[in-house]
Amino acid sequence: MIQKISSILLLLLLLLVSNNGFAQINQSILMLGGQEIIGVPLDQSPEEIVLKTTKKNGKVKILLIDISRVFSVTQNGQEEVWYNPDSSETGYSIKEMRYYIKGQQDGRNEHKTTLPVITSFLVSGALAALTGSQELAVVVLSPIPGTLIGSLTKGNMPSNEKANGGEPMSQAAYIAGYKQSARMKKIFHSILGSVAGTVAGGIIGLSIASSNS
């Protein structure tokens, strides 16, 4: 009887160890947008992957990843490309899509948004100060013009060194990816600049209105 119980306990222990070992195998998922997501796969269907990720603070988060947005999955140093050129709207080959993804990553990491932020801050700040000084309710709409003008500032292209290297089609894919990412970054930072400008300008405008009353 004791021997039988010991065998069962040993079997359960082996199952537990093997399950834990499997669960700790991380996958690195490269998205078509250039994001890299690292986590433990929990489940997978034809449409999505259920991934468990752990943040730097130790907090665990469960993500549902759309498989159609995945370029490749790397596990144990081996990359498996999931991207299918035939089902892609871009028409990029696997090699060209790599350049497109690299462009998105560089645009997100390297593109400077100083001018859009300053422009959106000044435009929204000036409008907020003006409308706030007159105690007009439209002061809350001040971020909109600043965001629009900041987003329209020029400069979504990569550096000449990166834009002019490589084969023509790969070069075009890289530039397209960079411009897409740079545009989104510029819009987001313009929104932040406009909101900050509205707050600063609104405080100044309301202070002026208060001193005049």
Over which residues does each language-model region extend?
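Bacterial N-terminal signal peptides that target proteins for export
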Residues: 1-9
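N- or domain-start disorder-to-order transition segments that initiate the globular core
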Residues: 13-14
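N-terminal signal peptide c-region/cleavage motif recognized by signal peptidases
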Residues: 18-20
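Compositionally biased alpha-helical segments
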Residues: 22-188
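Short, solvent-exposed mixed-charge patches
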Residues: 24, 212-213
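Surface-exposed short loop/turn segments
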Residues: 58, 211-212
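Final/C-terminal transmembrane alpha-helix of multipass membrane proteins
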Residues: 188-208
